[in-house]
From Swiss-Prot:
Belongs to the glycosyltransferase 28 family. MurG subfamily. The keyword Cell division applies. Cell wall formation. Catalyzes the transfer of a GlcNAc subunit on undecaprenyl-pyrophosphoryl-MurNAc-pentapeptide (lipid intermediate I) to form undecaprenyl-pyrophosphoryl-MurNAc-(pentapeptide)GlcNAc (lipid intermediate II). It is found in: Cell inner membrane. It is an enzyme of class 2 (transferase). One of its GO terms (biological process) is cell division. It catalyses: di-trans,octa-cis-undecaprenyl diphospho-N-acetyl-alpha-D-muramoyl-L-alanyl-D-glutamyl-meso-2,6-diaminopimeloyl-D-alanyl-D-alanine + UDP-N-acetyl-alpha-D-glucosamine = di-trans,octa-cis-undecaprenyl diphospho-[N-acetyl-alpha-D-glucosaminyl-(1->4)]-N-acetyl-alpha-D-muramoyl-L-alanyl-D-glutamyl-meso-2,6-diaminopimeloyl-D-alanyl-D-alanine + UDP + H(+). UDP-N-acetyl-alpha-D-glucosamine binds at residues 15-17, 127, 163, 191, 244, 263-268, 288. GO terms for cellular component: plasma membrane. This is UDP-N-acetylglucosamine--N-acetylmuramyl-(pentapeptide) pyrophosphoryl-undecaprenol N-acetylglucosamine transferase. Its EC number is 2.4.1.227. CDD domains: GT28_MurG. It comes from Escherichia coli O157:H7. Its main location: membrane.
């Protein structure tokens, strides 16, 4: 059956880890002739980002329940019901053939609305530990996929859809073989930065001296203070930027990455074929630890959990990796990646729409 005229509604919101993989799948299916709309919330990143990609977006009112107190919990059933009713009205008007839930609060009422209308629900879990919304929706979903093994016991492991410019990078052997001079260390704390990395890495630079050159993404509002920290450590030569717009270029430059281990970051690093030193964000589910673990087990990365993080721990780890070791780790990272994740997710969406 032709994809021409098929309609998809993507449900994803809140963070780049949910939105960017959804956009990758949306563009893949749009290139095949699908119509795509988005279900999101008006006060999160998808509200601005999705329309820039040429995709119309509908909004419902919903937010998270964690840490909101007893009053919010009492009001939650009514809020979820209202959001479900809004999503149901949107879907009755749009009539999607299938909905794709990529996570975020919006997927909960959106998935329930689709199910109540008899529309197939396809889920993708980006993290190594399933989010609360996807745990609930998995019971009614037509198909459940996961990026890393372990989030769901029987779900297919398909990887995370990542940006095409990252997938297009030369293989590690072509990129890294023959490199000389200081080891190029890319420090990434996510779009918000990571205070612990901003505090630690200037001191690491002082310990390692001329053996490294660092490109440090500080996050919003931190560039000046991080530059000052490098200068005070006697290392003013290192590059500090608030954001990195072209992550593919940054990955191509780097020999090794020091970063948090959000799901999309881990998947991009594997797809790029880069060794990594992961410092997982401390979360009660240890979500980022479980995201990073497959690459550590593959011999492509090392995890230092935040309570054990120190200047010496980072400096000694980086100093212990020769260029030969870094190339081996990079090749293992690339071998552990699933470069056709976007196509795999898109194929399951197509299959569910035909069922």
């Amino acid at each position: 059956m032709s994809a021409q005229g098929k309609r998809l509604m993507v449900m994803a919101g809140g963070t780049g880890g949910h939105v960017f993989p959804g956009l990758a799948v949306a563009h893949h299916l749009m290139a095949q002739g699908w119509q795509v709309r988005w279900l999101g919330t008006a006060d999160r990143m998808e509200a601005d980002l999705v329309p820039k990609h040429g995709i119309e977006i509908d909004f419902i009112r919903i937010s998270g329940l964690r840490g909101k107190g007893i009053k919010a919990l009492i009001a939650a059933p009514l809020r979820i019901f209202n959001a479900w009713r809004q999503a149901r009205a949107i879907m009755k008007a749009y009539k999607p053939d299938v909905v794709l839930g990529m996570g975020g609060y919006v997927s909960g009422p959106g998935g329930l609305a689709a199910w109540s209308l008899g529309i197939p629900v396809v889920l993708h879990e980006q993290n190594g530990i399933a989010g609360l919304t996807n745990k609930w929706l998995a019971k009614i979903a037509t198909k459940v996929m996961q990026a890393f093994p372990g989030a769901f016991p029987n779900a297919e492991v398909v990887g995370n859809p990542v940006r095409t410019d990252v997938l297009a990078l030369p293989l590690p052997q072509q990129r890294l073989a023959g490199r000389e001079g200081p080891v190029r260390v890319l420090v990434v704390g996510g779009s918000q930065g990571a205070r612990i990395l901003n505090q630690t890495m200037p001191q690491v630079a002082a310990k390692l001296g001329d053996s490294v050159t660092i490109w440090h993404q500080s996050g919003k509002g931190s560039q000046q203070s991080v530059e000052q920290a490098y200068a005070e450590a006697g290392q003013p030569q290192h590059k500090v930027t608030e954001f990195i717009d072209d992550m593919a270029a940054a990955y191509a430059w780097a020999d090794v990455v020091v970063c948090r281990s959000g799901a999309l970051t881990v998947s991009e690093i594997a797809a790029a074929g880069l060794p990594a030193l992961f410092v997982p964000f401390q979360h009660k589910d240890r979500q980022q630890y479980w995201n990073a673990l497959p690459l550590e087990k593959a011999g492509a990365a090392k995890i230092i959990e935040q309570p054990q993080l120190s200047v010496d721990a980072v400096a000694n780890t980086l100093a212990g990796w020769s260029r030969e070791t870094l190339l081996t780790m990079a090749e293992r990272a690339r071998a552990a990646s699933i470069p056709d994740a976007t196509e795999r997710v898109a194929n399951e969406v197509s299959r569910a729409a035909r069922a």
